[in-house]
Amino acid sequence: MNSAGRVHRSRAGSRGHAAISPLTMASFSVARGIRSSNVYDDTDDELSILTFFSAVRRNRLTSSLPPILSARCSSACFSVRIVLPLSLTISISALMYSTNSALGRKLTGAFSIQTNIEQSCGFFRTSIMATLPPIECPIIIGPPLVFNSCFVIKCFTSSDMTS
C-alpha cells in the first residue's frame, strides 16, 4: 500500500505459490444512508472464491463474506469505501470481524484500519482499508478445504450514533 492508502496489485508470480495471499477488494457506496451498491473484484481466483453481500439498515452498512474455499494458508484484504454528501458526516464506531471455521476455531476482534478522507464534487469519500489476519489451514491433497466462515464489517454514520 502506498502513502495515499491505495493498494498496488500484481499478478506476477501468483500461480503455483502457496505463500501468496489472495487479495480481494470490495467497494460499498452509501447514498443518504438508505441505499448501497456492491462492487465485486476477485484479483486471484486461483487461490480463493470470495463473494460479498451488503445491506443498509438504519444507516448501518453490514457486509458478510460467505465461506472461503481454499486449500492453502490464506489472508484477505478488504477496502470499504463510503461516499456521503457533504451535508452528512460519517463516524466509524466499529469495524469488526467474526469467523466460525470448520476446524473449530473462532476469531473475533477489530480490523487494523487506515482511513483516507477526500472531498470531491460535493461528496466526502472515506476509504477504509481493513486487513484480516491470516486464516491458517493445512496444506491438503485433494479437494479444497471449505471454511464455514463469515466476516461482518459494520460501519456507522453519525446519524446512526444519535438514534
From Swiss-Prot:
GO terms for cellular component: cell periphery; plasma membrane. It comes from the Eukaryota. GO terms for biological process: cell wall biogenesis; cell wall organization. It is a single-pass membrane protein. The keyword Ligase does not apply. Its main location: membrane. Keywords: Cell wall biogenesis/degradation, Membrane, Transmembrane, Transmembrane helix. The keyword Cytoplasm does not apply. Disruption phenotype: Hypersensitive to cell wall-perturbing agent calcofluor white (CFW) at 37 degrees Celsius. A similar phenotype is observed at 30 degrees Celsius, although the severity is decreased. Decreased expression of genes contributing to cell wall organization during vegetative growth. Signal peptide: none annotated. Induction: Expression is dependent upon the presence of the cell wall integrity pathway mitogen-activated protein kinase SLT2 and its downstream transcription factor RLM1. The chain crosses the membrane at residues 76-96. It is found in: Membrane. Involved in yeast cell wall biogenesis. This is Protein NAG1. It comes from Saccharomyces cerevisiae (strain ATCC 204508 / S288c). The lineage of its organism: Eukaryota, Fungi, Dikarya, Ascomycota, Saccharomycotina.
